[in-house]
């Protein structure tokens, strides 16, 4: 993997800097590095493809070295270099696609394609000019089964989940009380509702709770917490739990009371926030527990009082909600990130070349299914294909 990264970094620099008119002295170190790459690769043959619709291609390396010059690089010099650069880039592109198309149940972090396996050989260790990539560093740690640390802007840690729980129900569905939620990506929205606006609840207060368990622990998370759940702020028709009928939800939004959010790790509370909104920090957690209340307003204007009558029918439904959004966090496991294109790149290649479903990844790289059943095998394979995708993105836009 280090060799693949070094090749890509060298080729990217060469493509950007070996241009007509450039002083040779400004790129002499790069050209020496480029020539070292050619010397190491010359005389070797590789094969890529042969999976799905990814065509088999054979690669032979027999290129001349770039010479020295006292002055500026002329058109002939650059044209000669371009021919070599374009062939190498095409090779790297195909190695990356070949690697992204493959998976393995055991040791999925190791190279799976024939070409990348060959590049891992001892004879190519001289191509190791730059090992500064964050993904390469983490791939090395994962490969040695040591602690890794990935900084994500918006980690897609929550599998998609949208449902409701009724704490009070009737066959007519005309006096309900319960919670509904939508968890997806890096955001949780949860709402508590009571058609009767807590008229018969103790002290006219309804208590709600929402617990979300993460598939992997997060650390040093920056989180936005808001006293509202906008996705549950408009009328809708909802299918009943048994699918036999539908019921009408017509929310009127109240501000939640006594909001408390707990961040737990292995069942132990690490951070707790009470009635605090905006930006909060969670140190280390694998579970989020939200507690909040719906309180019937003790004093109401006639207009508000008309919304919440003392008895049925209840045409407007008192609702309170929370939004919790993870803006950034560190995770020891590789995850898709809303601000990165790695998952999209891998999925696109696998779809374009009709890669058959293997033993590890779900059909279509379905992220909800993948993260819901996030096994060590999937983690290893994701680490590898995301690393390859990050390398490919240097050259292929």
From Swiss-Prot:
Query: One Pfam family, short name please?
Result: Rota_Capsid_VP6
User: Keywords in UniProt for this one?
Assistant: Calcium, Capsid protein, Intermediate capsid protein, Metal-binding, Ubl conjugation, Virion, Zinc
In which compartments does the protein localize? Virion
Does the record carry Ubl conjugation as a key word?
A: yes
Has the keyword Membrane been applied to this entry?
A: no
Among InterPro entries, the record links this protein to: Capsid_hemagglutn, Rotavirus_A/C_VP6, Virus_capsid_a-hlx_vir
Q: Which residues bind Ca(2+)?
A: 266, 286
| Residues at which Zn(2+) binds | 153
Annotated family: Belongs to the rotavirus VP6 family.
Q: How does it assemble?
A: Homotrimer. Interacts with the inner capsid protein VP2. Interacts with the outer capsid glycoprotein VP7. Interacts with the outer capsid protein VP5*.
Recorded hits in HAMAP family, A to Z, give:
Rota_VP6, Rota_VP6_A
The name this protein carries in UniProt is Intermediate capsid protein VP6
Species assigned in the record? Rotavirus A (strain RVA/Human/Japan/KU/1995/G1P1A[8])
Recall the taxonomic lineage recorded for the source organism: Viruses, Riboviria, Orthornavirae, Duplornaviricota, Resentoviricetes
């Amino acid at each position: 993997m280090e060799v693949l990264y070094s090749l890509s970094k060298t080729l990217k620099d060469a493509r950007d800097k070996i241009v007509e008119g450039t002083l040779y002295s400004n790129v002499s170190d790069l050209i020496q590095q480029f020539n070292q790459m050619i010397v190491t690769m010359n005389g070797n043959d590789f094969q890529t493809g042969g999976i799905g619709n990814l065509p088999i291609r054979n690669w032979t390396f027999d290129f001349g070295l770039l010479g020295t010059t006292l002055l500026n690089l002329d058109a002939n010099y650059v044209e000669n270099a371009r021919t070599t650069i374009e062939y190498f880039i095409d090779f790297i592109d195909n190695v990356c696609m070949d690697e992204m198309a493959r998976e393995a149940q055991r040791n999925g972090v190791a190279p799976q394609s024939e070409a990348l396996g060959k590049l891992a050989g001892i004879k190519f260790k001289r191509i190791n000019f730059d090992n500064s990539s964050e993904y390469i560093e983490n791939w090395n740690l994962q490969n040695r089964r040591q602690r890794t640390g990935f900084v994500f802007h918006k980690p897609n840690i929550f599998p998609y989940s949208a449902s409701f729980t009724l704490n009070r129900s009737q066959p007519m569905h005309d006096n309900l009380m319960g919670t509904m939620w939508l968890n997806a990506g890096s955001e949780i929205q949860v709402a508590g509702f009571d058609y009767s606006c807590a008229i018969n609840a103790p002290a006219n207060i309804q208590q709600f709770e929402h617990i979300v368990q993460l598939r992997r622990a997060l650390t040093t998370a920056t989180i936005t917490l808001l006293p509202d759940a906008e996705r549950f702020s408009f009328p809708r028709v909802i299918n009943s739990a048994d699918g036999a009928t539908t019921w009408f939800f017509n929310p009127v939004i109240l501000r939640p009371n006594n909001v408390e959010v707990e961040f737990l790790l292995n069942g132990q509370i690490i951070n707790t926030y009470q009635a605090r909104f905006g930006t909060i920090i969670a140190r280390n957690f694998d579970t989020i527990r939200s507690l909040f209340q719906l309180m019937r307003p003790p004093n109401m204007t006639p207009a508000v009082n008309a919304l919440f009558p003392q008895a049925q029918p209840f045409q407007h439904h008192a609702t309170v909600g929370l939004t919790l959004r993870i803006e950034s966090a560190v995770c020891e496991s590789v995850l898709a990130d809303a601000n990165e294109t790695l998952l999209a790149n891998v999925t696109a290649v696998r779809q374009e070349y009709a890669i058959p479903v293997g033993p590890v990844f779900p059909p279509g790289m379905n992220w909800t299914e993948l993260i819901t059943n996030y096994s060590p095998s999937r983690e290893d394979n994701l680490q590898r294909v995301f690393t390859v995708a990050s390398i490919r993105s240097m050259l292929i836009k």
